[in-house]
Amino acid sequence: KITLFAQVIQKLPKELIKSLAKKHGTDKYAKGFNTWSHLVSMIFCQFADCVSLREISNGLHSANGNLNHLGIARAPSKSNIAYQNEHRSCAFFRDCYYALLNYFGQQISLSGRKFRFKMPVYALDSTIITLCAEVYDWARYTHAKGAVKLHTLLNFRTLLPEYVHITDGKSGDNTAARNVEVKPGSIVVCDRGYFDTLLLRFWDSIKVFFIVRVKENLLYERIEERDLPDKAHPEVLIDEIVRLTGN
């Protein structure tokens, strides 16, 4: 519902976004569709799961009576969105992302939310975003479809994405993970798509701890079994030091 969406939008620091728009000069030649309206429209695209510019425009037009709650004077046309998507600097949206990440990260820190780990804990995963193969021929994924893959590092403390790496849709998770910036002393939790001995050795070399699901055909030998602490979680069955023996 648009009223629920409006509550989300009202959480955005409008003055911060205005200052970024001024810095990048993105409201020059705005033609009635300023930077704030553009940002809100693209966020609406994600929340409403729109698959075309027409759906964005029609969706906002259907909420004409509530647009003032979004800080928008009028709903944009399809051509307005298309023009500004092509001509408005992507640098604004990049800086906007990092500014909002910092802003909301501070808000969460000030809220006093408890976190049981002293070390930073991250979840690393990827998702496919489909694209039109005819328009984005560089992102061809299959014979008929295009796609890019987003590799996202989610901070468990703030529940916010801290780093996003974009590759072509065919890129392997383990390959792309080498370009994801993980701070030494952190814990990374990931699926078996990231189980790669070279990647794990690299993380180990920079003092990054990892929790990863192993592949079913993993070959290894047991070196030592450690005693479990008295307060070990009941689902922790065994603690072993092992050596990988596969090629």
Please annotate each region the language model reported.
Residues 52-62:
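Polyanion/phosphate-binding surface patch
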Residues 1-49, 53, 68, 72, ...:
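Dynamic "connector" segments at or just before major functional cores
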Residues 147-151:
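Short glycine-rich loop/turn motifs
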Residues 41, 56, 75-81, 122-128, ...:
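Short, conserved catalytic/metal-binding motifs centered on acidic residues
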Residues 73-138:
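Active-site- or DNA-interface-adjacent structural scaffold in DNA-acting proteins
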Residues 1-24, 112-114, 223, 227-247:
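A short, flexible helix-boundary coil/loop motif
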Residues 98, 105-106, 112-114, 134-146, ...:
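His/Asp/Glu-rich metal-coordinating catalytic cores
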Residues 161-247:
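An internal, acidic/charged active-site-proximal segment
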